[in-house]
Amino acid sequence: IMNNWVKKQADFCIVGKKGVRDNLQIAVALLGYRQEKAGEEIIECLKHQFADGHAVLTWYPYDDTRYSDQPFWIVWAVCELIKETGDFSILEQKVSWQDGGEATVLEHVKAAVRRLIEDKGENGLVKIRFADWNDALNVTDDPEAETVMLSHQFCLALRELRRLMERIGEEDYAEFLGQEYETLKAAINEKAWDGEWYARALSRKGNIGAKDSPGSKIYLNAQTWAVLADVAEGTRLSAVLAAVDSMEQDFGFPLNMPPYPAYDPHVGRMSGMLPGLFENGGVYCHATGFKILMDCKCGRGTKALETLKKIMPDSGKNPSSRSGAEPYVFTNCYSTNSGYYGKSYQSWPTGTSAWSMMGLYEG
């Protein structure tokens, strides 16, 4: 599966998806074996970024809803492209903006950084706007709400871009990025730490993913990206790893626990889903892929491999005869709801293929 079918699945995603966030993740996975195609896809995604730094969710069909995370994926993907190819000249390539004109790849990256800095809220974290990576977490009753997951991701982007800028001699900008990293990291640890794990979002109307939050108490992505970005250190790192381990299920790790029992307008669409399905407490295999990289970073190779096996097609504890998915294709989600336990939802077009590859080949 990992030497053949997962690559076919990634190729399918590149053809079938036309979204900045989605295609950049697939493109980075392609860097391991189709560098030219990966580079072309990353440049194509940059063409759908606006000069103010934000980017469309999808260009076909066209959707410019303000998902706050698009700029992060741009910075991350360009850094990964150059790390894999060693071709620094990419930074000088001219690429058009979605709203007209053109600029170098480096200017596109800097615009993405500016967008995320300008989008910071009162706690110093990045505002969630309509949603972040989790399309269904819509804190629409508080336009000032801040996303902890994306703030972790922005820390990672600042760290990686600083290293790149040092390599090309942009020392002043590298120093600026380093200062931004430390400032954001400190804000996250001051405002989002909840004693045993990180909250998922901060809001004047009540934090989401905290121990005193109604409905659901802990979110996976707010922990995994804290580790990947080096935000969680020392005793907090140990606590985060323990919190993640406590979420383990037979066939992966749920996006949040426990599921929301009823619709909560403060949380948005995910809380209206049947408990245990999709984003509402389902095992979101794409996000479990983030967890695999977290394990690898921490030297937890055995746990990384065990986790990968849990979400593999036709896995031992959730065979295709129960999940309903093809025995050779990764799926996006498995249900933890007792009435649909282990059932698969949406195989083929999912970032699970990309993150599973990255976990196995790069972790």
Q: Which functions belong to the PLM regions below?
A:
Residues 121-130, 191-193:
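C-terminal ends of transmembrane alpha-helices
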Residues 16-18, 215-218, 281-283:
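Short helix-capping and inter-helix turn/linker motifs at the boundaries of alpha-helical repeat units
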Residues 5-9, 26, 45, 181, ...:
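Conserved hydrophobic/aromatic pocket- or pore-lining residues that grip, position, or stack substrates
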Residues 11-12, 47, 51, 80, ...:
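Conserved helix-loop functional segments at active or binding sites
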Residues 20-23, 29-126, 147-151, 155, ...:
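Aromatic-rich carbohydrate-recognition surfaces in CAZymes
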Residues 56, 153-268, 309, 313-344:
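Catalytic cores of carbohydrate-active enzymes
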Residues 1-18, 40, 44, 115, ...:
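Low-complexity, Ser/Thr/Pro/Gly-enriched N-terminal "stalk/linker" regions
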Residues 52-65, 129-146, 203-212, 267-277, ...:
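Acidic/His metal-coordination segments adjacent to aromatic residues that form catalytic metal sites
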